[in-house]
Design a protein with these regions (language model features):
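Short glycine/proline- and aromatic-enriched beta-strand/turn motifs that initiate or cap beta-hairpins
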Residues: 16-59, 190-195
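Membrane-embedded beta-strand positions of outer-membrane beta-barrel proteins
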Residues: 25-29, 40, 52-56, 92, ...
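Gram-negative (and chloroplast) outer-membrane scaffold detector with strong preference
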Residues: 44-129
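Outer-membrane beta-barrel "beta-signal"
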Residues: 91, 95, 182-195
Length: 195
């Protein structure tokens, strides 16, 4: 319980007024080899070539053999090999822009590296919502990371659109839902705006 309290304090400090001097806020969509999710980030510049990032992600892990079958008589879909596992990475890292001043227009390629703690929420595989996510919920803490490349496209209204391709490093403490890691390739689409 102390770890969850520490984790929540860390998350709330990221969104507090004490760091209101950050240059960019943003959100986006993750589509990965092992699942999909959303991310929320804050970015601030150290120089034209280097930015620092903090982000929290909500990542819904999928079983590699998960399938959805449609019942044509009722129109209802059924999932098989479904797992209930949410990962909440809280990563900090940097974006490096190697081509500053070398590429014209509003296109800015970058390299990104992030690392930090991961809270894994493992719900039961069957039952009601309460039985899956409240009564039978297990949680674990580990450390993980991300590295990748991408590009920012700056628009005229102070919005930055980003696309990134990278690799998640998401280890687990032992076997959780059949695997001890959920590493995999990841494509990220993001939208940032100046604060």
């Amino acid at each position: 319980m102390k770890k969850i309290t520490y984790y929540l304090i860390l998350i709330s400090s990221l969104s507090s007024q004490s760091i209101s001097s950050l240059n960019y806020n943003g959100f986006g969509l993750d589509i990965g080899e092992r699942g999909s999710g959303l991310f929320f980030n804050r970015t601030w510049s150290n120089s034209e070539k280097l930015c620092f990032i903090s982000e929290i992600r909500i990542f819904d892990v999928k079983h590699p053999d998960e399938i959805i079958i449609q019942d044509y008589y009722t129109g209802r879909g059924y999932k098989f090999n479904d797992i209930n596992l949410l990962l909440l990475p809280l990563f900090s890292g940097a974006k490096y822009y190697p081509f500053v001043g070398k590429i014209a227009n509003n296109f800015a390629p970058f390299v990104s590296v992030k690392a930090g703690p991961i809270l894994s929420l493992d719900g039961a595989e069957s039952g009601t919502f309460k039985e899956k996510w409240i009564t039978n919920l297990d949680y674990y803490f580990t450390l993980g990371g991300y590295f990748g490349i991408g590009a920012d496209v700056l628009t005229s209204n102070q919005t930055i659109l980003s696309i990134r391709v990278g690799y998640d490093i998401l280890p687990m403490k032992g076997q959780i839902d059949g695997s001890d890691q959920y590493n995999g390739a990841l494509v990220r689409f993001g939208c940032n705006w100046k604060k």
